[in-house]
Amino acid sequence: MMRFTKFYAPSLKEAPKDASLPSHIFLTRAGFVEQIGSGLYNFLPLGKRVLDKIKNIVKEEMDKAGAQEVNLSFITPASLWQESGRYNVFGKELLRFKDRKENEFVLGPTHEEAMLSLVKNKITSYKQLPLHLYQIGLKFRDEARPRFGLLRCREFLMKDGYSFHANEEDLGREFELMYKTYSQILQRMGLDFRAVEADSGAIGGSGSKEFMVLAKNGEDDILICENCDYAANVEAAKRAKKTCQDERPEANYASKFHTPNIKTIDSLAQFFKINAFYTIKAVVKKAIYENESKLVVFFIRGSDDLQEVKAQNTCSALELVDASEEELKKAGLVAGFIGFVGLKDIDFYIDFELENEKQMIMGANEKDYHLIGIDVVNLNKDRFKDLIEVKEGDCCVKCGAKLKQSKGIEVGHIFKLGQKYSKAMNANFLDENGKSQPFYMGCYGIGVSRLLAVAIEANHDEKGCIWNKTLAPFVLEIIVSNLKDEKALEFANKLYRDLTNLGLEVLLDDRNERFGVKMNDFELMGFPYALVIGKGLENNEIELIQREGLVKELIKTDELMEILKKKVL
């Protein structure tokens, strides 16, 4: 029998000092988790029960999709990461260490290399493909500033899966299957989510979708079409080409115009009495690479902003930082007057919406001068890239309707890795013609421990957690208001046995505490329902409380089981 007096759930009156998000505050106060170090958490019985439910849902859906579960070592030899080329690229988040024999290892934040090593030289023929292996295990990422509880910690539980294919078409089929599988996982958990276009980040690859649970405290900005199913992370969002109804500036030919001290887009637009849409803005960044750094110039409309992740991917840099005035001078660039005409010895890219635009105004690479009447034509096609940040109110690239901005928390990510890792690690198979080919790979991750926190970020109130029936550690709590009332206690014990025999997860609060304390804990822990057995039992009445909205209802004892079967079971 699951009695509160025997159940370990130490609740706290005060939240941790560094806790700012509801999930961090309530999960710690309610005794679901306990922080033992920076970004490190223990899961107590309540938290472990929820964690197991999440794991079971993930496992059931992955198995249903034909994936096979394995369990890889938490520690990976550094040689595998060196072979793939990620050892130095990944940065300080990758925890590197040596054993007593000076052998180098890493704590795996992801397991592409380890999983590829598992199948390399064992899957040798197209006849053995496709293959999808997954695991649910610990990961470690040495975050510089762990925060937000389970949402950004250093050690976390994750489901990561990897698929191997003979061709790109079959990889595409598996990608779509995982899209449906992840959608089903999150639907079963009762979460409001969107699958969004995304940047592949350090993992790499081409096709990429993130699964975002909508929450007002979300750390990611996402854009959602008001009409169709298009949704994208702001780092990867696209839009229908923007137009402007304002009059375009006219010049009979391209010419240089004196613009004294006109260094900003706003002052340039005012000077020529035009919309900034018809100007070209230069954004100069210093691109950091493994062994060097250099300046790169990105040209976009004056009315747009540079999307830095897009820009970083465009020039394949490890990082982009602002260029200093000294660096601009050294490169011969005049701040406020930079243009691509005549620009030499510096890499530059132009936003693809500017291609074939005419009668534009931009810097002349000379102090106090701009070029007018510029046509963006006859340039190398490779210079045109998607560089701008899409914003709320822009039009959907799929249907043309307006985009709205929302907040989301990433809980899953699926990638088409292609042949990036298999080529780097020389992992091949023989195709139908007997020719050696690198595997096509897919990668599919979902944050299991993160989902526990996300469920509360999406569903809580000022009093505490609000669990749905699928994820709740207990679906129903039976609260005896007065333990000295033997009749009430006897009724509660019998009710507990009857409900558990029906398969319901029930917690009996038999603590010798004030009724107010018990109710506060119920509201904090957030089980979907509570039954209060008190003085009303004399009139054959019991109070049923629904945690969401704290809706209360008096029920006759002879109708209780029937109502519980309808509402709770």
From Swiss-Prot:
GO biological process, one term: prolyl-tRNA aminoacylation
Enzymatic reactions: tRNA(Pro) + L-proline + ATP = L-prolyl-tRNA(Pro) + AMP + diphosphate
One Pfam family hit: HGTP_anticodon
EC number, as in UniProt: 6.1.1.15
GO cellular component, as recorded: cytosol
SUPFAM superfamilies xrefs: Class II aaRS ABD-related (SSF52954), Class II aaRS and biotin synthetases (SSF55681), YbaK/ProRS associated domain (SSF55826)
Cellular location(s): Cytoplasm
Molecular function in Gene Ontology: aminoacyl-tRNA deacylase activity; ATP binding; proline-tRNA ligase activity
InterPro entries: aa-tRNA-synt_IIb, aa-tRNA-synth_II, aa-tRNA-synth_II/BPL/LPL, Anticodon-bd, Anticodon-bd_dom_sf, Pro-tRNA-ligase_IIa, Pro-tRNA-synth_IIa_bac-type, Pro-tRNA-Synthase_IIa_type1
Keyword Nucleotide-binding: yes
Quaternary data: Homodimer.
Domain notes: Consists of three domains: the N-terminal catalytic domain, the editing domain and the C-terminal anticodon-binding domain.
Family per record: Belongs to the class-II aminoacyl-tRNA synthetase family. ProS type 1 subfamily.
Function: Catalyzes the attachment of proline to tRNA(Pro) in a two-step reaction: proline is first activated by ATP to form Pro-AMP and then transferred to the acceptor end of tRNA(Pro). As ProRS can inadvertently accommodate and process non-cognate amino acids such as alanine and cysteine, to avoid such errors it has two additional distinct editing activities against alanine. One activity is designated as 'pretransfer' editing and involves the tRNA(Pro)-independent hydrolysis of activated Ala-AMP.
PANTHER family: MITOCHONDRIAL RIBOSOME PROTEIN L39/PROLYL-TRNA LIGASE FAMILY MEMBER, PROLINE--TRNA LIGASE
Name of this chain's protein: Proline--tRNA ligase
Record lineage: Bacteria, Pseudomonadati, Campylobacterota, Epsilonproteobacteria, Campylobacterales
